[in-house]
């Protein structure tokens, strides 16, 4: 699954926001 990571946290392929 693709995951977007940033300083604020990350969002997985399903759109779930996860803490940094």
From Swiss-Prot:
<keyword id="KW-0813">Transport</keyword>
<dbReference type="GO" id="GO:0015288">
    <property type="term" value="F:porin activity"/>
</dbReference>
<keyword id="KW-0472">Membrane</keyword>
<dbReference type="GO" id="GO:0009279">
    <property type="term" value="C:cell outer membrane"/>
</dbReference>
<keyword id="KW-0998">Cell outer membrane</keyword>
<comment type="subunit">
    <text>Homotrimer.</text>
</comment>
<keyword id="KW-0626">Porin</keyword>
<dbReference type="GO" id="GO:0006811">
    <property type="term" value="P:monoatomic ion transport"/>
</dbReference>
<keyword id="KW-0812">Transmembrane</keyword>
<comment type="similarity">
    <text>Belongs to the Gram-negative porin family.</text>
</comment>
<keyword id="KW-0406">Ion transport</keyword>
<comment type="function">
    <text>Forms pores that allow passive diffusion of small molecules across the outer membrane.</text>
</comment>
<keyword id="KW-1134">Transmembrane beta strand</keyword>
<dbReference type="GO" id="GO:0046930">
    <property type="term" value="C:pore complex"/>
</dbReference>
<protein>
    <recommendedName>
        <fullName>Outer membrane protein 40Va</fullName>
    </recommendedName>
</protein>
């Amino acid at each position: 699954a693709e995951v977007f990571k940033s300083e604020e946290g990350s969002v997985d392929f399903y759109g779930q926001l996860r803490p940094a």
